């Protein structure tokens, strides 16, 4: 302090004030320039690099944290990428399953031998095809068939009714038929149940479910028509009679 005091005494008051002003001006200028440079850097980082630097910082902190965990967890950088890859592929698989769901797959079985002929087992419906013989499932596809009078087209086999579905394999529901003109009356066969549905009280689909065949989808019995016992329209006589034991009720087979 003495040295500085002696120096300031030598230069005089006027020169001292001038020196102080110069140093203050230099200090303020230097501080202004530093602040300007720092603010410029911060502004550029905010617009271009702050997000990236923040993400890098989070990743670095996460990796450091995971590396400090117990070795028994078997953590490594490779495990991170493996988990990420598994998560991504698993998500894609779920999306594919949503976009392409499994369609309805009806079940079919083959016809069996009844001694005199081959026919579908009871509880199924003859689908009139060699590769799709007897429908077990509730729903099935339309078939290219003779709809009557040598008129061919896509339709549901006899013993099934059209179903209101966009799935081709669910276009037909088995176990239903239309009433037939039997002995002058529109009625169901003796083994069918009248559902009460008709064109006056049902839509186009359910109106064709007039007779429920229940478990008797393949065979029915002879009916007293025109003064004699005979098979109704839409069936053919199998030759079985009540004396044939368990086959006694299989007197008339429905056409597919």
Curated annotation (Swiss-Prot):
GO cellular component: viral capsid
Region of interest called Hydrophobic, as start-end residue ranges on this chain: 24-44, 47-67
Expression triggers: Expressed in the late phase of the viral replicative cycle.
Post-translation changes: Stabilized by 3 intramolecular disulfide bonds.
Disulfide feature: 120-134, 156-172, 188-211
Main localization category: virion
Keywords for this protein: Capsid protein, Disulfide bond, Late protein, Virion
The organism's place on the tree of life at top rank: Viruses
Compartments reported by the entry: Virion
Free-text comment about domains: The hydrophobic regions might anchor the protein in the underlying inner membrane.
Subunit annotation: Interacts with the major capsid protein.
Function: One of the minor capsid proteins that constitute a network internal to the major capsid proteins and outside the lipid membrane. The minor capsid proteins glue and stabilize the capsomers.
Protein's UniProt name: Minor capsid protein P7
Lineage, top ranks: Viruses, Varidnaviria, Bamfordvirae, Nucleocytoviricota, Megaviricetes
């Amino acid at each position: 302090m003495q040295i500085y005091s002696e120096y300031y005494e030598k230069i005089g008051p006027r020169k001292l004030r001038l020196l102080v002003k110069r140093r203050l001006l230099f200090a303020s200028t230097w501080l202004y320039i530093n602040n300007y440079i720092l603010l410029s850097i911060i502004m550029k980082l905010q617009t271009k690099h702050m997000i990236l630097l923040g993400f890098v910082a989070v990743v670095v902190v996460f990796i450091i944290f995971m590396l400090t965990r117990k070795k028994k967890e078997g953590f490594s950088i490779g495990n991170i990428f493996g988990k990420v890859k598994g998560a991504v592929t698993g998500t894609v698989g779920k999306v594919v399953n949503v976009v392409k769901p499994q369609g309805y797959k009806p079940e079919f079985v083959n016809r069996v031998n009844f001694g005199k002929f081959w026919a579908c087992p009871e509880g199924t419906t003859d689908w009139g095809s060699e590769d799709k013989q007897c429908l077990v499932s509730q729903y099935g596809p339309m078939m290219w068939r003779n709809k009557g009078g040598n008129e061919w087209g896509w339709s549901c086999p006899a013993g099934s009714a059209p179903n209101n579905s966009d799935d081709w394999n669910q276009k037909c529901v088995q176990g239903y038929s239309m009433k037939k003109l039997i002995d002058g009356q529109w009625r169901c066969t003796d083994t069918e149940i009248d559902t009460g549905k008709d064109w006056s009280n049902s839509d186009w689909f359910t109106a064709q479910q007039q007779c429920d065949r229940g478990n008797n989808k393949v065979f029915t019995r002879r009916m007293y028509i025109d003064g004699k016992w005979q098979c109704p329209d839409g069936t053919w006589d199998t030759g079985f009679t009540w004396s044939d034991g368990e086959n006694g009720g299989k007197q008339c087979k429905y056409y597919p």
